[in-house]
Structure formats: C-alpha cells, structure tokens
Design a protein with these regions (language model features):
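Short acidic/glycine-enriched loop/turn segments that link adjacent beta-strands
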Residues: 89-92
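Conserved phosphate-binding/catalytic region of the ribokinase-like
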Residues: 1-4, 167, 195-297
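Short glycine/proline- and charge-enriched loop/turn segments
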Residues: 22-30, 180-182, 228-231
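Glutamine-centric residue-chemistry signal
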Residues: 44, 136-138, 282
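Ribokinase/PfkB-type carbohydrate-kinase core domain
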Residues: 1-10, 68-86, 96-229
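Hydrophobic packing within well-folded, soluble alpha/beta domains
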Residues: 48, 57, 70, 74, ...
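Nucleotide phosphate-binding site architecture
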Residues: 13, 187, 282
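Glycine-rich phosphate/adenosyl-contacting loop at the front of the ribokinase-like
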Residues: 1-60, 65-76, 236-238
Length: 297
C-alpha cells in the first residue's frame, strides 16, 4: 500500500451558503451555515487515505474546541496523527462563502498553522519512510522547504500544490517533482493566463506540471513529451470547496500505484467529480470504492 506523508495545514472551515456572493460593501442573508473540518493539508490527507493510501499528517492544531474535532476527523478517515501537534492558541480557520452555483470565496486565518515553521524530531524520519510527500502553502514557507529538501535527500516524490499562490524560492521548486496548481495559481506564478503557456513556463523550474482546470479537466506537461489534456466527468456542482485537494490526494495515490499518468489523472478527476456533488471539503471526499465505480462507469 502506498505510504503518503502530508505536511500542511489543518483548519476548521466556517462555511456560509448563499444564493449569490456579496459584493464589496454588501450584506446578504445566507441560507445555511456549517463548521466543517478542512485545511489544504488535512483535506489532501483525508482524500489520499479514503482513496486507499496509508497516510500520516504533519502539522498543528490549537488547544481550542476545534483542535480535537479536527484530529478526530483525520483519524476517522484513517489518517495517522502522531505528528499532528497541539499548540497554545486557536486552530486555523477558513471563512468560506459558497454560492448557489457551487463557487466559493475563501479567507484563511492561519492560527496554529503559523507555528509549523520547522520540522520537529521524528518528522524527517516519517518523510524519509514515505513514498510521496504532499505539500501546500498554508504553513510557513520555511517548513515547506525543509520538508521538500528532506524528501529529495531520501528519494521521496514531492508533490506541491502552490496555494495560496505566492512567489516561490528556486530551491523549493528544485526539490519539487510534480507541481499541481490550478489555472489561476499557474497564471499568478508565471504572469501568463493561457494554461498551456503557463505550464510551459513552469517547466523551466520544475520537471512536471499538472494544471487543474475545474470542469474543463486537467493538463499535464513535462519536458520530454507533448502536453496531455484529460477531461473531467460532466456533473452538476453543489460545492467545489476541496475539489482540488481531492484531485491531488487521489492523484498521489494513483501515481504511487504506478498507474500511467493519463489513467492517474482520470482517476483523480473521478474523485474530484464526486466531491463537488456534495457539500463541504473533507466531508465530500469519496472513498476508493466510490472512485472506482465512477471511474469505470
């Protein structure tokens, strides 16, 4: 079974559901509100575990009421939390508005995630024992870089989701095996709007790129082959929160199982398609049997 380590954020998502997202200065009435465990790191960990991997989470929660709930959610999905530490202060939160088309806008408050600025004893050994390391940018960049360099030193595949998008140091990109931005993040990193051109520009910095394109599917680019476009299943989206993390978690599992890249992307797209038909981030993530049924249908 593929062993995946995830170094990243754990947040409680505070989700308001509205008919139409408010404009600046506008107040609207929501139709529902929920607190849902999330955070890009935790989401990817849960997605990978439900997709069939052995998963370990490295990160931090606060000593508030949200911390134990997040830990319990991870463990219930099969994620090992021995390296998820509890620190003084609040757990990270994500304040999310979801409109009636399934689109969202998100503000993240780091909380305990801001304390994950270095690896602690035991983290390096965990990363070294994994088949892949999943990274995102909701924790301090120092820890992301330390994780990537540790993975490279031990021959562990590193998959980086550059979100929230920001300028990235060359040494982090040099330690990245696969970069998985969405089209907006790819444009932010390169200054190029067209995903094919943005992907080509990113290949100057990383060996392989998968750009997620929402309902349009995903695009794979590498230095030694033609670009590969893989469509997404056609579904009606209810809530797109966490869809990208679902894709990354499932993709990591498929690659760990040595599936060809086209099959791995299509399998991950099937997982993401299932997730957008349900509300919430981690709550929407499908199990392996569901992914297989969707993929083969």
């Amino acid at each position: 079974m593929t062993h995946i380590a995830v170094l990243g954020s754990t947040n409680m998502d505070l989700v308001a559901y509205v008919d139409k997202a408010p404009r600046r200065g506008e107040t609207v009435t929501g139709r529902d509100f929920r607190t849902i465990p999330g955070g890009k790191g935790a989401n990817q960990a849960i997605a990978a575990a439900r997709a069939g991997a052995t998963v370990s989470m490295i990160g931090a929660v606060g000593n508030d009421a949200f911390g134990p709930r997040l830990r319990s959610t991870l463990e219930h999905s099969g994620v090992t939390t021995d390296h998820l530490r509890t620190v003084e202060g609040p757990t990270g939160t994500a304040h999310i508005v979801v409109d009636d088309e399934g689109g969202n806008a998100i503000v993240v408050v780091p909380g305990a995630n801001g304390t994950v600025d270095h690896l602690v004893p035991g983290d390096e050994g965990l990363i070294a024992s994994a088949d892949a390391l999943l990274l995102q940018l909701e924790i301090p960049l120092e820890a992301v870089l330390a994780g990537a360099e540790t993975a490279r030193a031990h021959g562990v595949r590193t998959i980086l989701t550059p979100a929230p998008a920001r300028p990235l140091p060359p040494e982090l990109l040099a330690a990245t095996d696969l970069l998985v931005p969405n089209e907006h993040e790819a444009a932010t990193l390169t200054g190029v709007a067209d995903p094919f051109a943005a992907g080509a520009a990113l290949l100057d910095r990383v060996p392989r790129v998968v750009i997620t394109l929402g309902a349009a599917g995903s695009l794979y680019l590498t230095r030694d082959a033609e670009p590969l476009a893989v469509p997404a299943p056609r579904v009606t989206a209810v809530d797109s929160t966490g869809a990208g993390d679902t894709f990354v978690g499932a993709l990591a599992v498929a690659l760990g199982e040595e599936r060809p890249i086209r099959e791995a992307m299509a399998w991950a797209a099937a997982a993401a398609a299932l997730s957008v038909q349900r509300e919430g981030a981690s709550a929407s993530m499908p199990y392996r049997s569901e992914i297989e049924a969707r993929y083969t249908s």
